[in-house]
């Protein structure tokens, strides 16, 4: 009997169409949505991108980094350097952020990859702190107190004038819309790229390395190279995201740009409650996080306590996250990556392989 | 032609000589069984052949090339396939995906190019009916089968089996022996470490006895099992 390998599912195709519709709606949304909603969506989309990248690192690559704020911070500072020192357009300086993060990721990986498990996590955190302290010495960019993007740089960002006349809004609102569009593009491209990666043979290798590194090596998977690749890719895109966040904020300080709470702890929370090791996890997680944040933000310390308790509860009772819980119950996968072997029966289409062995159990 | 050859290979862990000037060769197409008491250095010997350990002295030759200093990854691609003593499946992947990753990376081919081979191996190892099952949910016998199938998927010239029959019931053991016999009959060269002697003697042409890291006997299974030294050391039978 002949067989073929299938990844596609009906739910997956429906989800794909829905995702495209959602992205199109997202792009035309600024025509009707108020400015604070666009700002909120910007925050959600950048957090989603960071969460997807952390999920790629920890959930697929087994690299539990607590130092991703290093790449957000260095990316943001590189963008600021491009604008303030070399007079670049802030939006065009965003790629500098990615490159700077990539350059920082090489020595970071070199040192951190010598460490395992919890030591790796702490090692990445230490490197992020060292980077923060070094950047705080950069007097041209405000040193320890930070600085703002100069007025003349933010006033004529590429595309802002066109958005102003298109939607008939003020310059500041037009800048938010531009940043939002970029965040939407970055989030969509990141998810699409990770999805492509997972469906590729590299996705199988990643899963193999995560499940059992020794066994992966014994079948010819170069575990070291794969971890390097994942770490560098995640750092590059995290750097881009950091730069984009600070194009919108337009004000930077080392403490904010290298904040372990904002750029790593919240991101880990999102991935853990949503569901680690699944593309759907961070999407659900960021929605839950946003709802909690907007309903509990007025309660100060209680807000953080609640986040902590929810994280603990999810880890104890739903270790695969809320999405894991849902997909276990329903069998739902919006982004199917599993290869299934289907028999091609010339009489009646396809059916799953069935064959009784002598010791069927 | 000798597929794999060890010449005076030694490996020490501190003061302990785990492998002591071991020499033997396995011609292409032969099955060699390795027996010896616990701690005799059997698994270490495997790690020296796969490249997971580098020897302190001696030479390992595979396919006529000196591979003594070659890393494990290179040797997988040259055709050294192994199974682990304790099955180590990729639990989050399906049985088919376990084979696909081994075949694709072990041979450096695209996923599509190895699909048919994976299906054939699944058939040979009686795992086809479980192709879409998550490896983490398999029974012990099927995990052992998956170890064998995944090693086969890398496209080996030499198959190293580490106590693959251990822990199975008599019936399960027979099923696995039949599978290994079939692979060997198709020309596969095998080195097999096993405590379940009857499983070993049902397949191999030669037996090697290891004790305290030294080869104390190598030859036809009947002759080895009859030798006084082996009976004393390994089987603990007073001669």
Report residues per predicted region:
Chain B
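Glycine-rich phosphate-binding loops of nucleotide-dependent enzymes
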Residues: 2-239
């Amino acid at each position: 009997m002949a067989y073929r390998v299938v990844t596609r599912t009906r739910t997956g195709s429906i989800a794909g169409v829905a995702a495209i519709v959602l992205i199109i709606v997202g792009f035309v949304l600024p025509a009707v949505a108020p400015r604070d909603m666009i700002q909120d969506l910007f925050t959600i989309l950048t957090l989603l991108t960071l969460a997807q990248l952390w999920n790629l690192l920890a959930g697929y690559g087994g690299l539990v980094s607590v130092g991703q704020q290093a790449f957000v911070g260095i990316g943001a500072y590189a963008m600021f350097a491009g604008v303030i020192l070399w007079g670049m357009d802030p939006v065009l300086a965003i790629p500098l952020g990615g490159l700077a993060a990539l350059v920082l990721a090489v020595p970071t990986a070199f040192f951190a990859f010598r460490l395992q498990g919890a030591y790796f996590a702490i090692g990445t955190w230490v490197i992020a702190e060292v980077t923060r302290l070094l950047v705080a010495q950069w007097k041209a960019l405000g040193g320890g107190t930070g600085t703002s993007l100069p007025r003349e740089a933010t006033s004529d960002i590429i595309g802002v004038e066109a958005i102003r006349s298109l939607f008939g809004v003020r310059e500041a609102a037009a800048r938010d819309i531009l940043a939002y569009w970029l965040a939407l593009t970055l989030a969509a491209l990141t998810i699409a790229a990770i999805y492509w990666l997972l469906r590729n043979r590299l996705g199988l290798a990643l899963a193999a390395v995560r499940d059992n590194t020794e066994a992966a090596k014994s079948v010819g998977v170069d575990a070291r190279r794969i971890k390097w690749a994942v770490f560098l890719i995640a750092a590059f895109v995290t750097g881009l995201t950091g730069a984009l966040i600070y194009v919108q904020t337009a004000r930077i300080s080392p403490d904010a740009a290298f904040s372990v709470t904002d750029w790593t702890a919240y991101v880990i929370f999102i991935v853990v409650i949503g569901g680690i090791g699944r593309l759907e996890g961070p999407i659900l997680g960021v929605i839950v996080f946003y709802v909690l944040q907007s309903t509990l933000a007025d309660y100060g310390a209680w807000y953080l306590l609640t986040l902590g308790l929810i994280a603990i509860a999810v880890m104890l009772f739903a270790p695969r996250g809320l999405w894991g819980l849902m997909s276990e119950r329903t069998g739902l996968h919006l982004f199917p990556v599993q290869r299934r072997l289907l028999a091609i029966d010339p009489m009646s289409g396809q059916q799953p392989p069935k064959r009784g062995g002598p010791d069927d159990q | 032609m000798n597929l794999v050859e060890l010449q005076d290979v030694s490996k020490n862990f501190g003061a302990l000589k785990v492998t002591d000037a071991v020499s033997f060769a396995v011609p292409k197409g032969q099955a060699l069984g390795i027996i010896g008491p616990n701690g005799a250095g059997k698994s270490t010997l495997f790690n020296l052949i796969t490249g997971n350990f580098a020897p302190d002295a001696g030479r390992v030759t595979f396919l006529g090339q000196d591979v003594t200093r070659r890393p494990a990854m290179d040797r997988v691609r040259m055709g050294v396939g192994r199974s682990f003593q304790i099955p180590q499946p990729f639990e989050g992947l399906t049985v088919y995906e376990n084979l696909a990753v081994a075949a694709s990376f072990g041979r450096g081919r695209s996923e599509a190019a190895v699909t048919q081979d994976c299906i054939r191996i699944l058939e040979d190892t009686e795992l086809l009916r479980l192709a879409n099952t998550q490896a983490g949910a398999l029974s012990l016998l099927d995990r052992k089968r998956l170890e064998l199938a995944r090693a086969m998927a890398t496209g080996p010239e030499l198959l190293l089996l580490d106590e693959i029959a251990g822990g199975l019931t008599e019936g399960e053991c027979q099923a696995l022996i039949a599978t290994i016999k079939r692979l060997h009959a198709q020309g596969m060269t095998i080195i097999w470490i096993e405590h379940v002697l009857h499983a070993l003697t049902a397949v191999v042409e030669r037996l090697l006895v290891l004790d305290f890291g030294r080869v104390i006997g190598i030859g036809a299974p009947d002759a080895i099992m009859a030798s006084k030294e082996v009976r004393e050391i390994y089987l603990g039978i007073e001669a």
